[in-house]
């Protein structure tokens, strides 16, 4: 084992591969991962902490499959917010419990004037429309150019994949 790292190189590769597949749904997911790579839970937690400190993770988050949970009315609210205000408006909207995702993107003029995007999920279209109307009212955005776009189709969601599976992993777990 490398004295600098809590896990040996093959264990690190296996752990990275498993993390990219998603955390197991368990009360102690890192213990489950530790068992799968033949290590201790503390070693796995320490390795993840070091990777985080080293900047290995750009984002570590949850991907919810909303449709499987009954949230079939999913809308992207797009707004054309003044550049001087977009960061503050984005932060305010991101704190709303109904907003699952909020981010800024460059406008693509002349066809696409919107620079702020918010995802809102609901069980029925009318429910989502009412939530959007209330959101616009609460944040005084009714006069800000905006549209809401409902999803017509669900695409596969998954996190980034950067690690090839370890060669012996396919034989053991494939």
UniProtKB/Swiss-Prot annotation:
Gene Ontology terms for molecular function: lyase activity
Keyword Lyase on entry: yes
EC top class named in words: lyase
Keywords tagged on the record: Lyase
Function: Involved in heme d1 biosynthesis. Catalyzes the decarboxylation of siroheme into didecarboxysiroheme.
Phylogenetic classification of the source organism: Bacteria, Pseudomonadati, Pseudomonadota, Gammaproteobacteria, Pseudomonadales
Protein name per its UniProtKB record: Siroheme decarboxylase NirL subunit
Gene that produces this protein: nirL
Highest taxon of the lineage: Bacteria
Pathway the protein takes part in: Porphyrin-containing compound metabolism
Binding partners and assembly: Probably forms a complex composed of NirD, NirL, NirG and NirH. All proteins are required for the total conversion of siroheme to didecarboxysiroheme.
UniProt note: phenotype after gene disruption: The nirDLGH mutant lacks dissimilatory nitrite reductase (NIR) activity. The NIR activity is restored by adding purified heme d1.
BP-aspect Gene Ontology terms: heme biosynthetic process
Catalytic activities: siroheme + 2 H(+) = 12,18-didecarboxysiroheme + 2 CO2
Family in the record: Belongs to the Ahb/Nir family.
EC number from the UniProt entry: 4.1.1.111
């Amino acid at each position: 084992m490398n004295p600098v790292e809590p896990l040996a190189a093959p264990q690190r590769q296996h752990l990275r591969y498993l993390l990219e597949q998603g955390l197991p749904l368990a009360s102690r997911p890192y213990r489950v991962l530790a068992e799968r790579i033949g290590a201790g839970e503390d070693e796995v937690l320490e390795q993840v902490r070091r990777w985080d400190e080293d900047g290995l993770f750009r984002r570590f988050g949850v991907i919810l499959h909303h449709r499987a949970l009954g949230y079939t009315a999913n809308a992207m609210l797009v707004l054309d917010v003044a550049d001087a205000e977009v960061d503050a408006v984005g932060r305010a909207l991101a704190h709303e419990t109904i907003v699952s995702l909020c981010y800024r993107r460059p406008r693509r003029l002349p066809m696409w004037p919107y620079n702020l995007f918010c995802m809102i999920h609901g069980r029925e279209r009318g429910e989502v429309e009412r939530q959007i109307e209330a959101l616009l009212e609460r944040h005084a955005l009714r006069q800000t150019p905006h549209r809401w776009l409902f999803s017509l189709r669900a695409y596969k969601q998954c996190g980034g994949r950067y690690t090839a599976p370890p060669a012996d992993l396919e034989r053991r777990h494939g």
